[in-house]
């Protein structure tokens, strides 16, 4: 518990209790904290304030200040005897992307700028991406989860075949995978870990958006472990800046027409992406950089300057453009937000 951001109580003076074992008040008065002098017509009130460790924040309502009542119970004005809880901070990388230097050849070196980025390895040793959205859950694509499996393979049989890494090659165990109920048209799935991961400089979830950031021309950042220009899987996490594209132009590019009877059966790269109301497209960067095989499951991360927070606007679904096609395709996170929240709450 301590490693995962356990609550820390600071004694102002007087008495303190063991925060991790309950709400029993224990006399801790000694010479290091002498009893304060009394004043006429006044009284002394014992108070503690709870804080969370670095990379965690108080989730419970109230200000974290507790006073000792006449029954020797610590209580908060808002929450009563209920102890506060700490949750992981999201979308606040210690080394944000604008502090990272571009390296030769247009490749981008991400030194902890994308702590939500995870690497997933299939049982056929194929690399794909996943995105940490809280201490125990990740988003990825349904296609990633099914890599090397038949379409009718059950989720419970898929989970044990996957290897997942966060931070600096820290392997984490998967408890279960859950597919979106309409995963043939919504290419998304959730991964639940057996244990919560400790959040730190290298491991931090990205925030889920409460509003839609997908506007044509908006630039997002996509990191990944996918194939490089030589079509080899990279050993170093890279990222690229990509603009949101016009959806109608993207549909016309891959399908030939927005009129169903005029659609062509084949896209310019030989594989047809899923394009519907749950998706959006992003084009090439101004340096003609792009995502490629193995990057799917990574977030289209946008930085909201108003609250200095990073949000996952999309999850890369179609990663086969590799600079040979004009657009990558992403699942729009706001369109699946209710499903994400309900699924996590139910599991």
Curated annotation (Swiss-Prot):
Name the record gives this protein: Haptoglobin
S-S bridge residues: 52-86, 90-207, 250-281, 292-322
Source organism per UniProt: Sus scrofa (Pig)
Main location: secreted
An annotated GO cellular component: extracellular space
Encoding gene, per UniProt annotation: HP
Top-rank taxon: Eukaryota
Domain Peptidase S1: 103-345
Region (Interaction with CD163) location: 259-264
Sushi domain ranges (all copies): 31-88
């Amino acid at each position: 518990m301590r490693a995962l951001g356990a609550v820390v109580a600071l004694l102002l003076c007087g008495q303190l209790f063991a925060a991790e074992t309950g709400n029993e008040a224990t006399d801790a008065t000694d010479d290091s904290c002498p009893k304060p002098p009394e004043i006429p017509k006044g009284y002394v009130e014992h108070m503690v304030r709870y804080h969370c460790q670095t990379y965690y924040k108080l989730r419970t309502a109230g200000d974290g200040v507790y006073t000792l009542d006449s029954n020797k119970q610590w209580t908060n004005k808002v929450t009563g005897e209920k102890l506060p809880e700490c949750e992981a901070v999201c979308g606040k990388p210690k080394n944000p992307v604008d502090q990272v230097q571009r390296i030769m050849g247009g490749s981008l070196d991400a030194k902890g700028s994308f702590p939500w980025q995870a690497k997933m390895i299939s049982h056929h040793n194929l690399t794909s991406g996943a995105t940490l959205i809280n201490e125990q859950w990740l988003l990825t694509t349904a296609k990633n989860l099914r890599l090397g499996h038949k379409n009718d393979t059950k989720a419970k049989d898929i989970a044990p075949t996957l290897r997942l890494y966060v931070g600096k090659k820290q392997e984490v165990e998967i408890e279960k995978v859950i597919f979106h109920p309409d995963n043939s048209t919504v290419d998304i799935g959730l991964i639940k870990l057996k244990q919560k991961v400790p959040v730190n400089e290298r491991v931090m979830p990205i925030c889920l958006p409460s509003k839609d950031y997908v506007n044509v021309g908006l630039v997002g950042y996509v990191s990944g472990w996918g194939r490089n220009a030589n079509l080899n899987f990279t050993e170093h996490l890279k990222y690229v800046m990509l603009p949101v594209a016009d959806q109608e132009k993207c549909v016309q590019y891959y399908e030939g027409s927005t009129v169903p009877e005029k659609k062509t059966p084949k896209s310019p790269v030989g594989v047809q992406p899923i394009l519907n109301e749950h998706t959006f497209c992003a084009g090439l960067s101004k340096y003609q950089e792009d995502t490629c095989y193995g990057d799917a499951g990574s977030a289209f991360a946008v930085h909201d300057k108003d609250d200095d927070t990073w949000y996952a606007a999309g999850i890369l679904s179609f990663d086969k453009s590799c600079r040979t096609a004009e657009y990558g395709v992403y699942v729009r996170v706001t369109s699946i937000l209710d499903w994400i929240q309900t699924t996590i709450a139910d599991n």
